Amino acid sequence: MKDSAPAIGIIGGSGLYQVEQLRDTTEHKIDTPFGPPSDALIGGNLSGRQVYFLPRHGRGHRILPQELNHRANIYALRSLNVRWIIAVTAVGSLQEKYKPRDILLPSQFYDRGSLRAGHTFFGEGIVAHVSFAEPISLQLRNLLAESAKKVGLTVHNGGTYVSMDGPAFSTRAESELNRRHGFDVVGMTNVPEAKLAREAEIALATMAMITDYDCWKVEEEPVSAQTVFGHLTANAEAAKKVLVEAIPRIPAEPDWAEHRSLDNALVTERKLWPEGTIKKLGPILGRFSGR
């Protein structure tokens, strides 16, 4: 769908399984070379912009963080000409000042995960190394911060998201160590999404919706699924308010640095690219392969 208008993607995290504000909706069941995405994508119009929504864990919350097919999810969005992604996610706070139901917009990631298979589109004859020093789109992050403030929400612009495997929550030792390192929130899903979005030349920002204090705060009950889900409805409604405010403010044309992230990343000479890999990565390599 490279001839379609540049679109905006929303990845919904725990508690955010639909966006009722989308109009003229259509369902898209997409098969990718990496397997199926988490669920059908819902396309629709929001304030005159084409938007595609994907529930990260599937409708009904059926998929563990470790079971997510991140490549299929990002590939499916890119095949629909998505050039911006707002990734909404539930996180635990590692700092007193970040409270449940606050929003934190990370500026950095620290990857403590060990399950990195499938965190790149490349290989099979084509080598690429994207720059990831600044893993979040600054323009999109600032736009989300301004939008959250405008609708009256408590938002923190910047901070470090530390990623863990899960599905179990942190031990107290892990939580305290993360705090001592100066990390701000902890989650299980966003690092691979950000890496793959960068490879797909999509500008991504994470909207981290705080549900708990992890387990470092000994005077409170440690995080549990019940704790998290107790805040999800309120956080989902807050996220929708931000999305409705932010999406009309995203530029119509993709001309940010993230939209050219492969310019200096591709290492393998074009003449050596295997035909099968070119075909497989069509939506990602289209502007280099002429397809």
Over which residues does each language-model region extend?
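Metabolite-binding pocket within alpha/beta catalytic cores that recognizes anionic/polar moieties
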Residues: 1-133, 289-291
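Short acidic/polar active-site loop segments enriched in Thr and Asp
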Residues: 83-84, 184, 203
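Active-site/ligand-binding-proximal alpha/beta "capping" segment
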Residues: 150-184, 260
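Zn-dependent metallopeptidase/amidohydrolase metal-coordination segment
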Residues: 188-226
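His/Asp/Glu-rich mid-to-C-terminal helical/loop segments that flank catalytic regions of hydrolases
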Residues: 215-263
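A short, charged, Gly/Pro-tolerant segment at domain boundaries
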Residues: 255-291
